[in-house]
Amino acid sequence: MTEEQYITALTNNPHGIRNIPNPTEAMQLTCVGQNGMLLQYIKEPTQKVIETALSQAPRAIQFVENPTEELLKTLVEKDWAVLEYISDPSDTLIQSALAQSGWAIRYIANPSEELQLEAVKANYDALQYINAPSEVVQLQAVQESYLALRYIDEPSVAVLEAAVKQDPQAMRQITTLTKDLALHLFKVSAAIVGYIPNTLGVTVDEIKAIIVDAISGDTVDEDYIRELINNKAIGGRQSKWPIDLLSLIDAYGTKIVKKIAVGEYLKY
């Protein structure tokens, strides 16, 4: 067969390259131009063939012997997932990959805590690719999204506190929720009160006692007070927690709490 005939055949079936001894550069280009991964079947490819293959499939870098740092940098900048096929990547390549996606952490061997933090800041769910993340990393992840709790087997109380502050829906992700824990988390975030399951046996009086402590204490958490006032789960008889919050504020609230309450109610 002539080179032209081979090229015609390879155009229709590029995988045929593996059965051709000593294919010409033109034949090689015909194949890798369609499927860069076919580079694995080409012995001693020219630079042009390598570049064509990588342009079509960056993952073909795994079949390139001794690639230059410049080439690797160009590929990683195009597709962070290429990091998977780079052995012992430089700090520059790692930073480039993480700048695109926190998921790149999965391809970094023994990443430092600093790199782990960078990863979960970019993508909270990168936590799933980190082996035994420290509490610091867990905290950063849940501060980005409470859904990071899905990837933490035994979250500490501090992590749970951070999660409910990020979003009260975090309560739905807590698989070991107890009455005591629910009451503790209510002290941290008033917004979670509507997510406390009835099955825990939390009483109205217990919720009321925590509210009284919050509004009468020497130190006032203004955000907490606003969460209380604007929480639809607390209020009339039809609400989940039929507590007359205004009466409690009037009877036990500090001047600061009463001022906040007036400001919040004037919004409506």
Task: List PLM regions with ranges.
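Alpha-helical scaffold segments
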Residues: 1-268
